[in-house]
């Protein structure tokens, strides 16, 4: 999975099938490929903590709970699996936790989270 962001409008696009693309554009400019963990945010508040219990997957953002305030919060948590992906949107005031259920024969691959100030983070 690859995430791209528009520098102007801040829109995020998710590429899920891995097909090569010459250039994704938004607002008349090329979109930037986001790389997990490339900002200066504290890893303990951003790297997803993942618990897999049978078909249930719980993703908590950070080993130290991430703030969920209007000015600083987790916008979404995405789960990559062997059969695709699932995504949950979060709002300020909510707990930085997302729960997912895997389908039969589906396995966890990675969890991603996006912080509005510190960008994309990943746990495999």
What is the predicted function of each stretch?
Residues 60-61, 97-104:
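Exposed aromatic-hydrophobic patches
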Residues 15-20, 34-37, 123-124:
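Short Cys/His-rich "knuckle" micro-motifs
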Residues 61-69:
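Short amphipathic, basic-aromatic surface patches that mediate peripheral association
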Residues 12-13, 30-31, 119:
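Cys/His-rich microdomains that often coordinate metals
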Residues 114-123:
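Short acidic/polar inter-strand loop motif in beta-rich domains
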Residues 6-9, 26, 115:
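Short cysteine-rich clusters marking metal-coordination/redox-active sites
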Residues 3, 23, 112:
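Residues immediately within or flanking Cys/His clusters that coordinate Zn2+
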